[in-house]
């Protein structure tokens, strides 16, 4: 017999015969939710319900509605789609089919050029396969059998994947009817758990993301635990399409990106205003919270990157140039540079903590296929800071940072923030004592503030644990922006130290921290969160004054000067155009406040006020209108 324990919903234990299946354990220990369980965590490892459990351990259920459960049924859907495509187009060769956020895709090599016109037939075939409710069966195969099987099918992409599996590592396949795919799993017990699905788009994708390889056909889809959840997702995607920051910014003339500078932003005047407002806002917050702003070089010698470890682990993502037979790398991050400032003189423990911030321009050689507007770029500015401190100071610094972070998110209109703690990975540097203390120094501030957080087991970096802060936008999408990362390794590698109270050298802890992540991406998030109607304090034009006729142009100019003297960003449209046309143009440009000025308004030194999103016009004295305007543009 073996003993199985669980902490869900309360700590309980049960005895089972050796080699009991996950399905039997689920039925016995979680009878009320057994029908919705698609897999189990066994001692922290995810496995399907058919796999036997042969020793004492702990289990936790994975239900179909959970994030992990949804990931599993999307993996199921990817296999079902691959099977359907092959049944419709027998010459199809299969590449890879992973899950992605809210969906899945599969890469195909076939003679037929797939288009969205094929989706109906593929979806119909998928529905037929699901209706059969065949089981997903996991099998472990000897390497030779797997190679022969895929050779006989001519599946050269699978053979290439097999060739990269280390000798001695278990090779698993999943069978579904007569369909067999190379796969680690896990999968749900059978196809019926894929309750609702839809194919969404098709694109080209190079095999393994390498432009030297063949271009494959990638079909995307989404799958959900219910038709209602699918309908809600489709509605949100349609709403997201309307909010696409690339389209909105193009309409408003805020920025553009072109092929001659892939992944780098051409900021237009109004977009650059938004950028600078955000930068200056963060700068003021940093000063208030005790940070010192620095500026470091963009290119540094290869030797520094070798010392920091980035050359070994990050070189393929770095832009490298040669100068006088030296290799220089354009920096992909700021941290090694900040260490250089720290170690530029002897530091005392009395100086710590040192909070060093930079709006650092960084570059990363991201694959061209992954670039996406402002959300994924090659050239970007991090609102980056590094705190050099002692182990004893970490807790208070994390507490201070969280308070700053929440101030910022609230001002930008984000009230829903989730927190995740990524703790020690299996491969790590440092003693268990250091990791215990470090994890506690991240958890204690959250506990003290009553902040709920989830734990990403084993997902910390090898050099320290981290907290991640994720925003939820107005249509429910999540964006990971803020980070607190402890680092025991970099200061040691780069020779940073301070003189302690004992007169000896000590290595500081570095806290890597960011609030926005990158300014570019955060602006993209803001545009989509507000559908382009960003708050007045951020708007590049806060007030537009429209003249009804040329007779009031001088009065309108006086109004513009009055507003400008109060640091309002104002534009005057005194063109000889129809006033209705001017109003429509101001609405299209999403100007928060519009003052309309005609003979009547000029006669009594007033204005007619229109707010964006409201069709109503309010007549008031110019002085009162300005006071109301100043209140509006100062609100955060």
UniProtKB/Swiss-Prot annotation:
Cofactor note: Binds 1 zinc ion per subunit.
Location(s) in or outside the cell: Cytoplasm
Coiled coil: none
Domain of life: Bacteria
Molecular function GO labels: ATP binding; metal ion binding; threonine-tRNA ligase activity; tRNA binding
Keywords linked to the UniProt accession: Aminoacyl-tRNA synthetase, ATP-binding, Cytoplasm, Ligase, Metal-binding, Nucleotide-binding, Protein biosynthesis, RNA-binding, tRNA-binding, Zinc
InterPro entries: aa-tRNA-synt_IIb (IPR002314), aa-tRNA-synth_II (IPR006195), aa-tRNA-synth_II/BPL/LPL (IPR045864), Anticodon-bd (IPR004154), Anticodon-bd_dom_sf (IPR036621), Beta-grasp_dom_sf (IPR012675), TGS (IPR004095), TGS-like (IPR012676)
Chain residues that bind Zn(2+): 335, 386, 512
Annotated spans, Catalytic: 244-535
UniProt cofactor(s): Zn(2+)
Record carries keyword Metal-binding: yes
CDD domains attached to this UniProt entry: TGS_ThrRS, ThrRS_core
Positions of transmembrane segments: none
Domain TGS: 1-63
Entry keyword annotation includes Aminoacyl-tRNA synthetase: yes
Catalytic activity: tRNA(Thr) + L-threonine + ATP = L-threonyl-tRNA(Thr) + AMP + diphosphate + H(+)
EC numbers, comma separated: 6.1.1.3
Cellular component GO terms, alphabetical: cytoplasm
GO biological process, one term: threonyl-tRNA aminoacylation
Assembly with partners or alone: Homodimer.
Entry's family note: Belongs to the class-II aminoacyl-tRNA synthetase family.
HAMAP family referenced in this protein's UniProt entry, alphabetically: Thr_tRNA_synth
Function description: Catalyzes the attachment of threonine to tRNA(Thr) in a two-step reaction: L-threonine is first activated by ATP to form Thr-AMP and then transferred to the acceptor end of tRNA(Thr). Also edits incorrectly charged L-seryl-tRNA(Thr).
Protein name stated in the entry: Threonine--tRNA ligase
Gene this protein is translated from: thrS
